[in-house]
Swiss-Prot record:
GO terms for cellular component: nucleus. One of its GO terms (molecular function) is ATP binding. It holds the Pfam family TIP49. It is an enzyme of class 3 (hydrolase). ATP binds at G73, P74, P75, S76, T77, G78, K79, T80. It catalyses: ATP + H2O = ADP + phosphate + H(+). It comes from Kluyveromyces lactis (strain ATCC 8585 / CBS 2359 / DSM 70799 / NBRC 1267 / NRRL Y-1140 / WM37) (Yeast). SUPFAM superfamilies: P-loop containing nucleoside triphosphate hydrolases (SSF52540). Keywords: Activator, ATP-binding, Chromatin regulator, DNA damage, DNA repair, Helicase, Hydrolase, Nucleotide-binding, Nucleus, rRNA processing, Transcription, Transcription regulation. Its EC number is 3.6.4.12. The gene is RVB2. This is RuvB-like helicase 2. DNA helicase which participates in several chromatin remodeling complexes, including the SWR1 and the INO80 complexes. The SWR1 complex mediates the ATP-dependent exchange of histone H2A for the H2A variant HZT1 leading to transcriptional regulation of selected genes by chromatin remodeling. The INO80 complex remodels chromatin by shifting nucleosomes and is involved in DNA repair. Also involved in pre-rRNA processing. Disulfide bonds: none annotated.
Length: 467
């Protein structure tokens, strides 16, 4: 009996999801904060981007906080893209928190608690700490293991270009060296306070020890001077993270689970007092960040009242709000106001307006999106998508790119042609054609009273119910 085996190979694709604003890497400004026509994924909206550049400078200076900025404009005019560009330009050191207006309505947290947490996530604290480090090249590691499996003992010989020292090793340090796979010739750094071992690389003097090296092997110079050095380390945390850690016995676990719950105001007051002391002593530096609230018209009057008060607080970020509403009711009231915001909050805000894109800007954006999604469009297909975007919306035409690609792949083509876009246009309705369809067949839909006419035509045969 013969047993046949068959080899099967499967290619695993990496997870590379493309979001709506993944092509944006900044605001596209030059050194003088003047916007370029098309740069860093941003196209058009020159006046709005110039205004966002001023806000960017305010945040980077760090001297101004507690300001409200409202970005108002019609749908599909790049309001969220403007905020994403601002967050990319700020970098990792400045906290940036983005939420939607509907996120704060939860059964677990009150509205004010959810807003407070969002505000405090947007305030960073740079805590300076002086630590003693031992940096040098490992000459030799001797580890003596007991036959009975008891405590391990060992010696570590470490050197710089100027000196060499032998350290006695305890059980914890031996485990750390084993975990980091430290060998003779490695350049390491040991934190004396915590015992943390960091592998910096391999010494240039040992570069010829092996014929083959891994791709992640890094060669560094042997450290100079003293073995023990003092180094200032800066830790950046948000106020919310400090709140969570101090709110319960094992609060640091809540940072990973997300189960923060309501945090008492007394805890926050104590933290504010302590942070103020650190600031006076020069141990900490406050970094006002940015809180971006999209669809801000979804908030109600109580939330707007809270934001008014929170903006006056000592620890307040710059709040950027976005809305596409015109004259509409403020949620929770019967009063109409511009953009659906109360007049007192509008009075505190500086307002940036966005305008509809023209055909050339839509074409540029669609070109950037097709490059980001790795879709090859023919010039005629790009022109057709531009016309569709001008007549319907930019979102609809950009959504058709990936759909048209699937249709093109169905006919074994790598390039999206006009017929692929036309087929996608016929298969998927835009909002205007959808409204027209609903109006035409309104009688066949369930209305707001729960009634529907299920008969297709007046002259159709109906069931006889007169018996």
């Amino acid at each position: 009996m013969s047993i046949q085996t068959q080899d099967s190979q499967e290619t695993l694709k990496s997870l590379s999801l493309i979001a709506a604003h993944s092509h944006i890497s900044g605001l596209g400004l030059d050194e003088n904060l003047q916007p370029k026509p098309s740069s860093q994924g941003m196209v058009g909206q020159l006046q709005a981007r110039r205004a966002a550049g001023v806000i960017l400078k305010m945040v980077q200076n760090g001297s101004i906080a507690g300001r409200a900025v409202l970005v108002a404009g019609p749908p599909s005019t790049g309001k969220t893209a403007l905020a994403m560009g601002l967050s990319q330009s700020l970098g990792k050191d400045v906290p940036f928190t983005a939420i939607a207006g509907s996120e704060i309505f939860s059964l677990e947290l009150s509205k004010t608690e959810a807003l407070t947490q969002a505000f405090r996530k947007s305030i960073g604290i740079k805590i300076k700490e002086e630590t003693e480090l031992i940096e040098g090249e490992v000459v030799e590691i001797q580890i003596d293991r007991s036959i009975t499996g008891g405590h391990k003992q060992g010696k570590l010989t470490i050197k710089t270009t100027d000196m060499e020292t032998i350290y006695e090793l305890g059980n914890k340090m031996i485990e750390g060296l084993t975990k980091e796979k430290v060998l003779a010739g490695d350049v390491i750094s040991i934190d004396k306070a915590s015992g943390k071992i960091t592998k910096l690389g391999r010494s240039f003097a040992r570069s010829r020890d092996y014929d083959a090296m891994g791709a992640d092997t890094k060669f560094v110079q042997c450290p100079e001077g003293e073995l023990q050095k003092r180094k200032t380390v800066v830790h950046t945390v948000s106020l919310h993270e400090i709140d969570v850690i101090n709110s319960r016995t094992q609060g640091f676990l809540a940072l990973f689970t997300g189960d923060t719950g309501e945090i008492r105001s007394e805890v926050r007051d104590q933290i504010n007092t302590k942070v103020a002391e650190w600031k006076e002593e020069g141990k900490a530096e406050i970094v006002p960040g940015v809180l971006f609230i999209d669809e801000v018209h979804m908030l109600d009057i109580e939330c707007f009242s809270f934001i008014n008060r929170a903006l006056e607080d000592e620890f307040a970020p710059i709040v950027i709000m976005a809305t596409n509403r015109g004259i509409s009711k403020t949620r929770g009231t019967n009063y109409k106001s511009p953009h659906g915001l109360p007049l007192d909050l509008l009075d505190r805000s500086i307002i940036i307006t966005t305008k509809n894109y023209d055909a050339s800007e839509i074409k540029t954006i669609l070109t950037i999106r097709s490059t980001e999604e790795e879709v090859e469009l023919s010039p005629e297909a790009l022109d057709l998508l531009t016309n569709i975007g001008s007549e319907t919306s930019l979102r609809y035409s950009s959504n058709l790119i990936s759909v048209s690609q699937q249709i093109a792949q169905k006919r074994k083509s790598n390039t999206v042609e006009v017929k692929d876009v036309e087929r996608a246009y016929l298969l998927f309705l835009d909002s205007a054609r959808s409204v027209k369809f609903v109006q035409e067949f309104e009688s066949q839909y369930i209305d707001d009273k729960g009634q529907v006419n299920i008969s297709i035509g007046k002259d159709e045969d109906a069931m006889d119910t007169t018996a």
